[in-house]
Each structure stands twice: as C-alpha cells, then as structure tokens.
C-alpha cells in the first residue's frame, strides 16, 4: 500500500509538475533512504512502460565499474543517458552497479539540470545532509560552539599576521628603504642625433632651474606683504616673468590706463559742437590739455613704465573699442520763415539718438525746395538740415563718432552762390560724401597723436629709471 502511494507521488512529480526527479531529491522529499529511492524509481519506470509502451520517459543511469586505461586499472562512476548505456557498459571491464539516477519527461542535453536539482535540495538540508545517505562515518562528530569560536579566532589571528607581513614588505619598497634599483644606462646616439640629444638635456636642466627660482621668488613675495593683488598673479603667470616685478608693472599699467581715460574725456568734450562757445575758448582749452598731461607724466616719472608689448595691446584694445554709429536717415525737411530780428537765436543741438547696430547708408543728396520770395521781392531766410559728425564718450568709456542732422540758417542768395561754386569745381554728390570722411579722420588723428605722446613720455621715463 505504501509502495503504491510512493509510485503515485512520483507520477505526480514527473507528469503533472514536470520536475526532474533524482534519487537524492526523492529521498529528502519523501524521507527515505537513498537505496530505497533508487528502487522506487526503477519500479516506476518498469510499471509505466508495461502499462503504456509509448510513454514519454527519459531515464539517466548511474554506472560504476573497473576500467583498464593506458595499462592501469581504474574505478569509473558515470551518469549516462539510456541511449548510451550499452556503449559505456561495453567499455567497462567489470560492471559493479547500475542504478536509476533520474526520471524526467524532457530529454536533457547535459548534466546541468541534474546538478541544480541536487544542489537545491542539499542546500535546504545542510544540517542533515548525511541523514539518508549510504556513506556514513561514526567518528565524525559535530563540534561544540565554544570550540568552533576558538578555532575561528585562531584562523583570524593567523590571517592578520600574514596580512601585516605583506604590508611591511610593501612599506619597505614604497618608503624608499628597499634595495636600490639598478639604473638603466641609455646609450646616447652618435653623430648629429647625439648633439641634439645633449642640447635637449641641457634645455630641460635650465627649465628646471628657472622653475625653482620662480617658485622661490613667489614664496618670498607672498611672505613680504599684501601689496600684490590677484590680477597681478594672473598676469605674472601669463607672461612668465618674476612675480614682484610683474606686480609693480601691472599696478602702473592700471594707473596709466585710468589716467589716459581721464585725458580722453576733456578731448571729447572739446570736440562736441556748441554754438554758444566762441572759437577762442576752444583753442585755449586745447593748448592747456597737453600741459596737464605733461604735469601728470612728471609726477609718475619715478614709476616703472609699460613695456612695448603691453602698450601695443592697450592700443589694439582701444582701436577695437572705437565704434562709428550712424543714425537712421530721416526725411529732411526745410523750414521757411520770413526774415525777422528774433530769427538769429541759436538752437541747442538735438540729443544723440540711441545707437543702432546696423550701419545704414547715408543719403548722398537732399532735395532742396525751390527758393521762395515774398511779394515785395525780398529774400527769405531758410532753415536747412545738414549732416554733421559728432564724437562723445559712451557709458563704457569708448569714443563714439555719430552723424547727426543739425539745422543751419541761410538765405536764398547764399544758397544759390554755394550751388554755383560747387557745380563749377565738383559735382554736388562728392561734396556731401567727402565731408563726413574728413570729419571722421579728425578725432582719430588727434587721439593717435595723444597716444604717441604718452608712449614717448613713458619710454623716456623707463630709460631715466634705469
């Protein structure tokens, strides 16, 4: 009766649950001895094949026996499929045992699934792994917990001792106390290549010396005082010179740029057109400016002047920062009004329009309305809009030249005379074009002359210092 229940359980595992049933798995699952599990599997296969000859069952066998190989006899244990059982039996000299190892529905390609099945069941029964086994040893007794803890401590101590020895050996080599390494003497190439190699070695030695001296100077400068700013460090690293000398030169360069900006401001204010100021005052202010510049240059004559490279860089920056802006061309209109004593009042110049990024073409000629005469035949005084250039400093401190329309008063007779003279000498379009070019060149030449004067004074100051 019990055997019948076991066979039904095996049939359920194989057919219904589609499991791989090994003799070890069956012994642990049903709690029977391994030899009994093997016998149960064999009985199940025999009964199943008698009942249904076409039953789909794949069986693996555990075969053991003696084998003569290379003139020596050896004991062989193998797990083979049913189709290879006869071939393995023929190779064995003496067959010791043949047992059913596993039963499954699917055909196995290798022994991996069999190993996984046994591994999982043994892992879940580690404490009683030899309970149902046929191999047993009575002398094998489990250790007490105290003995196991002491043995683990001894193992840890020995492991720590070994690790400390390895660390000591590593420290000897890393800290420089180890045996000196043999120097690899590289053979220098002969001839021209040898000359180049020796020159390269000398250059590397010189660069190492220079870097050491520069590092010493930087440390001395940092300990001496707090005069060196952050910008000085950046500039000294960039130009690759001594730290303290570059700090002084950078301070002088900043002060010189500030003074040049201060000098440029009055020049711009002089060039702004003011109708109320007379021409005599303008000339006197222009003469007074170089005197002020010379006085300021004398005051800072003791300082170190800028080098030629730095002056070129500042001039290039100034040239880049100059911009010429043209306003949008408005439709020009002439205003006609009768001659009166109050018509000679000077108008204030219109404020400069906002700077427009694209440069729009300047209109060459403006349409002039026909001359208007009164019924009495008198000439009328007219207001005419004329395109003039204006220079001023913007918010960034750049010199900006702008074309601005200004109104001028003229009579019909004066206008006719101007038209006649211009038609005799040159076409009217050329006069309108050349006026802004000449006026543009004026302020640029003035600023260039000022820059040259500043540079010459600074160079003379540099030679006086030396």
From Swiss-Prot:
UniProt disease link: Immunodeficiency 122: An autosomal recessive, severe immunologic disorder characterized by recurrent viral and bacterial infections of the respiratory tract and skin, appearing in early infancy. Additional clinical features include poor overall growth, global developmental delay with poor motor skills, impaired intellectual development, and poor or absent speech acquisition. Some patients have diffuse skin rash, erythroderma, sensorineural hearing loss, lymphadenopathy, dysmorphic facial features, and tooth abnormalities. Death in early childhood may occur.
Cross-link Glycyl lysine isopeptide (Lys-Gly) (interchain with G-Cter in SUMO): where in chain: 258, 433
Subunit structure: Component of both the DNA polymerase delta and DNA polymerase zeta complexes. The tetrameric DNA polymerase delta complex (Pol-delta4), which consists of POLD1/p125, POLD2/p50, POLD3/p66/p68 and POLD4/p12, with POLD1 bearing DNA polymerase and 3' to 5' proofreading exonuclease activities. Within this complex, directly interacts with POLD2. Following stress caused by DNA damaging agents or by replication stress, POLD4 is degraded and Pol-delta4 is converted into a trimeric form of the complex (Pol-delta3), which consists of POLD1, POLD2 and POLD3.
Name under which the protein is recorded: DNA polymerase delta subunit 3
Motif (PIP-box): 456-463
UniProt keyword Nucleus present: yes
Record remark: domains: The PIP-box mediates the interaction with PCNA.
Gene Ontology biological-process annotations: DNA biosynthetic process; DNA strand elongation involved in DNA replication; DNA synthesis involved in DNA repair; DNA synthesis involved in UV-damage excision repair; DNA-templated DNA replication; error-prone translesion synthesis; mismatch repair; nucleotide-excision repair, DNA gap filling
MF-aspect GO terms: protein-macromolecule adaptor activity
Residues with the Phosphothreonine modification: 277, 411
Cross-link named Glycyl lysine isopeptide (Lys-Gly) (interchain with G-Cter in SUMO2), sites: 258, 261, 433
Primary localization: cytoplasm
Lineage of the organism: Eukaryota, Metazoa, Chordata, Craniata, Vertebrata
Pro residues bias: start-end ranges: 349-361
Compositional bias segments (type: Polar residues): 455-466
Gene designation per UniProt: POLD3
Superkingdom, taxonomy of origin: Eukaryota
Entry annotated with the keyword Transit peptide: no
């Amino acid at each position: 009766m019990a055997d019948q229940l076991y066979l039904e359980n095996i049939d359920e595992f194989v057919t219904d649950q589609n499991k791989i049933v090994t003799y070890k798995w069956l012994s642990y699952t049903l709690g029977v001895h391994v030899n009994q599990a093997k016998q149960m599997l064999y009985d199940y296969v025999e009964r199943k094949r008698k009942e249904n000859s076409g039953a789909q069952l794949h069986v693996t066998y555990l075969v053991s026996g003696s084998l003569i190989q290379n003139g020596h006899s050896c004991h062989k244990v193998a797990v083979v499929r049913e189709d290879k059982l006869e071939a393995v039996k023929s190779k064995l000299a003496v067959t010791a045992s043949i047992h059913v190892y596993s039963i499954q529905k699917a055909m196995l390609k290798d022994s991996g699934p069999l190993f996984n099945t046994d591994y999982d069941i043994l892992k879940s029964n580690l404490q009683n792994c030899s309970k149902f086994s046929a191999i047993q040893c009575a002398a094998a007794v489990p250790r007490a917990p105290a003995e196991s803890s002491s043995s683990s401590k001894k193992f840890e101590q020995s492991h720590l001792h070994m690790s400390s020895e390895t660390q000591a050996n590593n420290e000897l080599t890393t800290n420089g106390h180890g045996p000196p390494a043999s120097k690899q003497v590289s053979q220098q190439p002969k001839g021209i290549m040898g000359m180049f190699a020796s020159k390269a070695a000398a250059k590397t030695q010189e660069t190492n010396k220079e870097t050491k001296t520069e590092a010493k100077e930087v440390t001395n400068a940092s300990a001496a005082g707090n005069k060196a700013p952050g910008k000085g460090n950046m500039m000294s690293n960039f130009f690759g010179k001594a730290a303290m000398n570059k700090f002084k030169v950078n301070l002088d360069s900043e002060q010189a740029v500030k003074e040049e900006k201060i000098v440029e401001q009055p020049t711009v204010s002089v060039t702004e057109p003011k109708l109320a100021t007379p021409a005599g005052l303008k000339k006197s202010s222009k003469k007074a400016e170089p005197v002020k510049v010379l006085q300021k240059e004398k005051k800072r004559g003791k300082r170190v002047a800028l080098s030629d490279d730095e002056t070129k860089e500042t001039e290039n920056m100034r040239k880049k920062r100059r911009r010429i802006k043209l306003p949008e061309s408005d439709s020009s209109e002439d205003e006609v009004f009768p001659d009166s004593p109050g018509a000679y009042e000077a108008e204030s110049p219109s404020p400069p329009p906002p700077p427009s990024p694209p440069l729009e073409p300047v209109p060459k000629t403006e349409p002039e309305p026909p001359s208007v005469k009164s019924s009495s035949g008198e000439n009328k005084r007219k207001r005419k809009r004329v395109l003039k250039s204006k220079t001023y400093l913007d918010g960034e401190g750049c010199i900006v030249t702008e074309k601005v329309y200004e109104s001028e008063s003229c009579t019909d007779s004066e206008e006719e005379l101007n038209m006649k003279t211009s038609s005799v000498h040159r076409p009217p379009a050329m006069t309108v074009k050349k006026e802004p070019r000449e006026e543009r060149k004026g302020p640029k030449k003035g600023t260039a002359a000022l820059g040259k004067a500043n540079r010459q004074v600074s160079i003379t100051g540099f030679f006086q210092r030396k």
